[in-house]
Amino acid sequence: MDEMFDKLQAVADRYDELNELISDPEVIADTQRFMALSKEEGELRETVDKYHQYQDVTQQIADDDEMLHDKLDADMESMIKDELKELTAQKAALEEDIKVLLLPKDPNDDKNIIMEIHGAAGGDEASLFAADLFSMYSKYAERQGWQIEVVDENATEVGGFKEIVMMITGNKVYSKLKYENGAHRVQRVPVTESAGRVHTSTATVGVMPEEEDVDIDIDPKDIRTDVYRSSGAGGQHINKTSSAVRMTHLPTGIVVAMQDERSQQQNRAKAMQILRARVYDYYKQQEESAYNAERKSAVGTGDRSERIRTYNYPQNRVTDHRIGLTLNKLDRIMNGELDDIIDALIVSDQAAKLEDLKNNG
């Protein structure tokens, strides 16, 4: 506990220093520095507020304890004891909140994301489920006030997607959607099933932080770029020049094709953006594989082959297998009401990290 309070005091001291700095006219004149310091101050504010609440509650407990040593009438003594019970519970709750706030932050949590959804096992039904997941995440993003841009899609004749890639931008997108990595299983009666039998299909979801200024060096010699003519349906803008771009990262074999933009330069920029994210994600998965072999985190490894969730339509049920959470409101979840699942995953992840901290110091 002493170590925790040393950390808290250091955070509080830094917070006070930041408040002085962002009031300094010289700092205010330097827009970039002012914004960086304001962001840091905002990130520390909740922790410092909780620390001050903790100090206040601790002082109130000490004052009440001292009063109990005085001669009191029965009613006053009973009232103080009741207050002490309440304050002790508040103190314990604040300690837990502070422990969570002091956990190491995921450096990617504030980032935007690139999300890929692939129809996997199940043919047409899997592609339709991929479209349903796209709709679910789009509605969730709308509820969060985030923006979605589809950057690539491979539609099927039945109205589904073999693959759809989108960028989601907004406040702390990765912190909430990083838990969606994995295989999503659906159990339902396909519209084409005349006998009414329930079929099982899967779609995979990949979530990667957008890496514009990523700490990863991609040697231009490691990228092969091919250009070709865009294809499009009748009535769409079709380039007569070679504006479509296919980039291959030779060391990993990762391929990105882009033809949605109107110029080769725009397609190159968008393809490079997605390639950087995929290459970063590839190496991140490689680094984490050894750790995950020793200890699977509460929310899974993030491996896209890992089945993380089942959506059972006949029973209106969604089960997240990583934390054993079952919710009987599939209709609302598919309408973008994901908060109950995501909040539970965050709490479970934090609990696992606290346990790790306790066991490994």
Curated annotation (Swiss-Prot):
<dbReference type="InterPro" id="IPR000352">
    <property type="entry name" value="Pep_chain_release_fac_I"/>
</dbReference>
<feature type="modified residue" description="N5-methylglutamine">
    <location>
        <position position="236"/>
    </location>
</feature>
<dbReference type="Pfam" id="PF00472">
    <property type="entry name" value="RF-1"/>
</dbReference>
<keyword id="KW-0963">Cytoplasm</keyword>
<dbReference type="GO" id="GO:0016149">
    <property type="term" value="F:translation release factor activity, codon specific"/>
</dbReference>
<dbReference type="Pfam" id="PF03462">
    <property type="entry name" value="PCRF"/>
</dbReference>
<dbReference type="InterPro" id="IPR005139">
    <property type="entry name" value="PCRF"/>
</dbReference>
<dbReference type="InterPro" id="IPR004373">
    <property type="entry name" value="RF-1"/>
</dbReference>
<keyword id="KW-0488">Methylation</keyword>
<keyword id="KW-0648">Protein biosynthesis</keyword>
<comment type="function">
    <text>Peptide chain release factor 1 directs the termination of translation in response to the peptide chain termination codons UAG and UAA.</text>
</comment>
<dbReference type="InterPro" id="IPR045853">
    <property type="entry name" value="Pep_chain_release_fac_I_sf"/>
</dbReference>
<dbReference type="GO" id="GO:0005737">
    <property type="term" value="C:cytoplasm"/>
</dbReference>
<comment type="similarity">
    <text>Belongs to the prokaryotic/mitochondrial release factor family.</text>
</comment>
<dbReference type="InterPro" id="IPR050057">
    <property type="entry name" value="Prokaryotic/Mito_RF"/>
</dbReference>
<protein>
    <recommendedName>
        <fullName>Peptide chain release factor 1</fullName>
    </recommendedName>
</protein>
